Amino acid sequence: SAAALYGAVAANGAIMVTTKSSQSGKVAINVSSNTTVETPMVLPKFQNSYGVSNQGTFSWGDKLASASPNYAKDYYNLGYTTNNSISLAGGNDNISSYFSYANVSSNGIVPENTYMSHNLLAKVGFNLWTKLHVDVSARYNNQHIENQPTAGYVGNPTLGAYLFPRGEDWDYYKSNYEVYDGTRNINVHNWTNTAQEQFSNPYWMLNRQKPVSYRNRYE
């Protein structure tokens, strides 16, 4: 799978760009664009019989009067990825060239997860002598990623969505993910049992602990 080859950033798929060699002849222009839509394939099933425990951290407390909604389903968004590209190729018997630009824009299924990349490629080939041909190429890649999906227990906002105590008010904590701490004069994350610090409000992590990465690569 793409994730196995390229890691968590490719959890929703990877776009493979195969470059062409510079060509001689008439100028050829190619333009392409496509969009894919992503949704979770499988979600965990939750028990709906017992609510929050007496410590306010986990489920399996008192029996619930009615079933709770699937908070994990409410947590995910409808994701999409759009790929655009344009290329020009042409030349003559002595010199040929190929230029391309492509971008990928993605909003992941995890809230606040975005990915944007720009790719530029230029290749020129020319004959110096009858038996000597030279190819010169240059490539530039720019990436901007916010809230790249993570795995594991620490720093994973999805954990809070999966372990949120059954029967609690998910919408309240979604809208009020932080509260003011007068003893420290700062806003802190608001959760069912903040004192236990078992895991954090996912919306606090997504909005206040947002990892952002940039990359510029030249070849």
Please provide the spans of the model-predicted regions.
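Short acidic/polar hinge/loop motifs at secondary-structure boundaries
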Residues: 1, 7-9, 13
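Hydrophobic or amphipathic alpha-helical targeting/insertion segments
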Residues: 132-134, 139-142
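Beta-strand elements of well-folded, non-transmembrane domains
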Residues: 105, 124-126, 142
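Short secondary-structure subsegments characteristic of cysteine-rich extracellular domains
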Residues: 113-125
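Residues embedded in well-ordered regular secondary structure
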Residues: 13-14, 21-112, 131, 148-152, ...
